[in-house]
Amino acid sequence: MQHKLLINGELVSGEGEKQPVYNPATGDVLLEIAEASAEQVDAAVRAADAAFAEWGQTTPKVRAECLLKLADVIEENGQVFAELESRNCGKPLHSAFNDEIPAIVDVFRFFAGAARCLNGLAAGEYLEGHTSMIRRDPLGVVASIAPWNYPLMMAAWKLAPALAAGNCVVLKPSEITPLTALKLAELAKDIFPAGVINILFGRGKTVGDPLTGHPKVRMVSLTGSIATGEHIISHTASSIKRTHMELGGKAPVIVFDDADIEAVVEGVRTFGYYNAGQDCTAACRIYAQKGIYDTLVEKLGAAVATLKSGAPDDESTELGPLSSLAHLERVGKAVEEAKATGHIKVITGGEKRKGNGYYYAPTLLAGALQDDAIVQKEVFGPVVSVTPFDNEEQVVNWANDSQYGLASSVWTKDVGRAHRVSARLQYGCTWVNTHFMLVSEMPHGGQKLSGYGKDMSLYGLEDYTVVRHVMVKH
């Protein structure tokens, strides 16, 4: 397994402390990797800053060609990437290969095209004898911090728009799941000029802090927890860096009496538990109107009970393990606290799976109240709660009564209601009669403590640029 860092076009061993990388399906150590030292972090940032002088002036065509080459290489090595992701994250191998790899390739290809469509406003005379134009230019060095739930996917979401816009990047994957990013480093080093992409390994305190606080870094992009986002925003405040934050969610799933119950059950069974629920848009907070509440709980409970947890390399496995032992304990604690309320009923699941690995049973909890922690706090595991509601006004207020604002869905056959409720929901994305669907052309990003800034789409590309005014006297 490739375990070296990419700094200034060269693969080098880390000079810091060694950290174990685990297989969450077994709990075994896969390998130990040395972190980047403080000197290596500085070298990576300075390499990116030096490379920006040329890369920032390349044509969109040149940048697009590099991104397309990288997409092709990822596609050609799709099985290798899927196997690494499966071993390091515990994802079912078939899901990593069939779902994630094609989407990752598409992200790079989309931004290759988008790079050639980015432009400022046409020139105009707004002062006599002067012509003004608006430019969208790259910022410089971008420090990107990727999470452990979708390591390669999130690396793609961060690298592709930043590079397409003409920035240079220093990427730090999670120390829990670094293997696909380090493999990407090996393949990318011969495609991009030295210093344009740099990939490090290490913990937040030892590598993340010196990276995000470096004076040469002009933007920090994070996908992670609210706590990590708060830390980075505070840590970078003195240097006035631009920040791009995607900080989790607790998606409300609003099911009205007239909804297609079978479609809801099928949707939540898939979208509430995909990736073992380790997804910030997971369909995890159901509000069911009282007329269909009992039926939905019964049918959904039966469906969730059929989800199969198992070995990642088993084609029939639907849920793999959680990412780490620490996270398994967090999820278990959240469910135990829900049980302790006395009014929340475990319909199915509610316990760790016996045996090796960090497995938690797919869990459905009914009877949750609006103020319960299981409704208000992100669990980030295979745990879905159901809360009954009376009417539209009540459920919209409840859905918006959350610190999160990333994703939501509305299930109804009433087109007017779908439009009306969607317009009032305080979430970056609202799906109607589906959930979880993402495409490269549409933006993904949140409100409130879920953060700000957009991934994917032309809006995502613009986030990695600075608007500049140039005026010429004539």
Curated annotation (Swiss-Prot):
<feature type="binding site">
    <location>
        <position position="280"/>
    </location>
    <ligand>
        <name>NAD(+)</name>
    </ligand>
</feature>
<dbReference type="InterPro" id="IPR029510">
    <property type="entry name" value="Ald_DH_CS_GLU"/>
</dbReference>
<dbReference type="InterPro" id="IPR016163">
    <property type="entry name" value="Ald_DH_C"/>
</dbReference>
<dbReference type="GO" id="GO:0051289">
    <property type="term" value="P:protein homotetramerization"/>
</dbReference>
<keyword id="KW-0520">NAD</keyword>
<protein>
    <recommendedName>
        <fullName>Gamma-aminobutyraldehyde dehydrogenase</fullName>
        <ecNumber>1.2.1.19</ecNumber>
        <ecNumber>1.2.1.-</ecNumber>
    </recommendedName>
</protein>
<dbReference type="GO" id="GO:0019477">
    <property type="term" value="P:L-lysine catabolic process"/>
</dbReference>
<feature type="active site">
    <location>
        <position position="246"/>
    </location>
</feature>
<feature type="binding site">
    <location>
        <begin position="172"/>
        <end position="175"/>
    </location>
    <ligand>
        <name>NAD(+)</name>
    </ligand>
</feature>
<comment type="pathway">
    <text>Amino-acid degradation.</text>
</comment>
<dbReference type="GO" id="GO:0009447">
    <property type="term" value="P:putrescine catabolic process"/>
</dbReference>
<keyword id="KW-0560">Oxidoreductase</keyword>
<comment type="similarity">
    <text>Belongs to the aldehyde dehydrogenase family. Gamma-aminobutyraldehyde dehydrogenase subfamily.</text>
</comment>
<dbReference type="InterPro" id="IPR016162">
    <property type="entry name" value="Ald_DH_N"/>
</dbReference>
<comment type="function">
    <text>Catalyzes the oxidation 4-aminobutanal (gamma-aminobutyraldehyde) to 4-aminobutanoate (gamma-aminobutyrate or GABA). This is the second step in one of two pathways for putrescine degradation, where putrescine is converted into 4-aminobutanoate via 4-aminobutanal, which allows E.coli to grow on putrescine as the sole nitrogen source. Also functions as a 5-aminopentanal dehydrogenase in a a L-lysine degradation pathway to succinate that proceeds via cadaverine, glutarate and L-2-hydroxyglutarate. Can also oxidize n-alkyl medium-chain aldehydes, but with a lower catalytic efficiency.</text>
</comment>
<feature type="binding site">
    <location>
        <position position="209"/>
    </location>
    <ligand>
        <name>NAD(+)</name>
    </ligand>
</feature>
<dbReference type="InterPro" id="IPR016161">
    <property type="entry name" value="Ald_DH/histidinol_DH"/>
</dbReference>
<feature type="binding site">
    <location>
        <begin position="146"/>
        <end position="148"/>
    </location>
    <ligand>
        <name>NAD(+)</name>
    </ligand>
</feature>
<dbReference type="InterPro" id="IPR015590">
    <property type="entry name" value="Aldehyde_DH_dom"/>
</dbReference>
<comment type="pathway">
    <text>Amine and polyamine degradation; putrescine degradation; 4-aminobutanoate from 4-aminobutanal: step 1/1.</text>
</comment>
<dbReference type="InterPro" id="IPR017749">
    <property type="entry name" value="PatD"/>
</dbReference>
<dbReference type="Pfam" id="PF00171">
    <property type="entry name" value="Aldedh"/>
</dbReference>
<feature type="active site" description="Nucleophile">
    <location>
        <position position="280"/>
    </location>
</feature>
<feature type="binding site">
    <location>
        <begin position="225"/>
        <end position="228"/>
    </location>
    <ligand>
        <name>NAD(+)</name>
    </ligand>
</feature>
<dbReference type="GO" id="GO:0051287">
    <property type="term" value="F:NAD binding"/>
</dbReference>
<dbReference type="GO" id="GO:0005829">
    <property type="term" value="C:cytosol"/>
</dbReference>
<dbReference type="GO" id="GO:0042802">
    <property type="term" value="F:identical protein binding"/>
</dbReference>
<dbReference type="GO" id="GO:0032991">
    <property type="term" value="C:protein-containing complex"/>
</dbReference>
<dbReference type="InterPro" id="IPR015657">
    <property type="entry name" value="Aminobutyraldehyde_DH"/>
</dbReference>
<dbReference type="GO" id="GO:0019145">
    <property type="term" value="F:aminobutyraldehyde dehydrogenase (NAD+) activity"/>
</dbReference>
<dbReference type="GO" id="GO:0004029">
    <property type="term" value="F:aldehyde dehydrogenase (NAD+) activity"/>
</dbReference>
<comment type="subunit">
    <text>Homotetramer.</text>
</comment>
